[in-house]
């Protein structure tokens, strides 16, 4: 925990809350969550660490937009990102159980109906259009002009980590992933819920979809990436299988390869945090256990790349930047010469 119940309670009191109770919810690794009860109404308080406080405004804004467009998410109430206090979003509590906890209690017919609702809700999120690609950044922007360039940049960062750790197997997996990116078609600019997890889907007592929760990892790019994140974690789940079938991805070899790519992409990204403490100091799962499916298919992407090919890759990445630098330098030189003459 990076917050305290007493500290949050004191802040809420200064902000006008009265006659309330707080209860800590021991779930998640990126945020601290509390149940807030006041005037017979129940809320969730989702608290963010200081270095991610900028997310409160962004996630709050997206939640408002989702609610307006009929997407099943928690209804936001208020947010705060004060520099001298706890940054949080307060939204109305969503009653129900997570789909992960509910899974074993559901019949095949119930799962089929729930998956219809889940797919529809996910597709509605993907209908939100953006202007660029990548992870959500401060001010709600996405920073890449190319989806491929975003993927390759993330893979390069992971490769550097594995190289530093002298983990040659995962270095070669990164090399294979990098090469596979060239086969991916540029998707349209659309929002991607990249926290697609059975833990982040709430099901009501009457076995209906109540809400998706957790939107701090929003991306802009290929919606299949979000589905693959579910696969990477829950590869053997009957719910995952049902969702893939409804998306038409289950029996399509090319699409399955793309799903595997995105699953392993998630693996190599999260692996770079494996030796770091979690923001709320909760235990971090062993990545091969947490992303079990991804760990079983990652070696399908292994490829040894020699130094010459590495140099070619570097040049392709830097070509545009070098061209801009050269043109800028020439224009500056011409301006100086012109001034001297």
Name each model feature, range by range.
Residues 23-141, 145:
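ATP-binding pocket architecture of kinase catalytic cores
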Residues 337-341:
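Sec-dependent signal peptide cleavage junction
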């Amino acid at each position: 925990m990076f917050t305290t119940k007493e500290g949050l309670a004191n802040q809420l009191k200064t902000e006008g809350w009265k006659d309330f109770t707080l209860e800590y919810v021991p779930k998640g690794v990126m945020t601290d969550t509390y149940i807030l009860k006041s005037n017979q109404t129940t809320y969730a308080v989702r608290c963010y660490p200081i270095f991610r406080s900028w997310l409160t405004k962004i996630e709050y804004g997206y939640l408002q937009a989702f609610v307006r467009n009929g997407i099943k998410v928690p209804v936001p109430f208020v947010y705060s990102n004060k520099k001298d206090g706890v940054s949080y979003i307060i939204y109305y509590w969503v009653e129900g159980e997570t789909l992960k906890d509910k899974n074993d209690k559901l019949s095949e017919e119930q799962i089929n109906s729930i998956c219809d609702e889940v797919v529809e809700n996910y597709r509605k999120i993907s209908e939100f259009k953006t202007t660029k690609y990548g992870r959500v950044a401060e001010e709600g922007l996405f920073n890449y002009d190319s989806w491929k360039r975003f993927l390759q940049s993330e893979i390069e960062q992971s490769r550097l980590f594995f190289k530093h750790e002298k983990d040659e197997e995962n270095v070669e997996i990164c090399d294979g992933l990098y090469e596979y990116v060239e086969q991916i078609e540029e998707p349209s600019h659309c929002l991607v819920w990249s926290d697609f997890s059975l833990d982040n889907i709430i099901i009501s007592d009457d076995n209906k979809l109540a809400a998706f929760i957790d939107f701090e990892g929003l991306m802009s790019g290929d919606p299949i990436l979000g589905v693959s994140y579910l696969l990477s974690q829950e590869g053997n789940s009957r719910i995952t299988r049902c969702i893939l079938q409804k998306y038409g991805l289950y029996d399509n070899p090319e699409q399955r390869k793309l799903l595997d790519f995105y699953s392993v992409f998630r693996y190599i990204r999260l692996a770079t945090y494996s030796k770091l403490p979690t923001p709320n100091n909760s235990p971090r799962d062993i990545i091969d256990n947490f992303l079990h499916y991804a760990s079983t298919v990652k070696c399908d992407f292994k490829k040894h790349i020699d130094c010459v090919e590495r140099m070619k890759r570097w040049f392709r990445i830097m070509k545009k930047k070098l061209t801009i630098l050269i043109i800028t330098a020439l224009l500056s030189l011409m301006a100086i010469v012109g001034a001297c003459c």
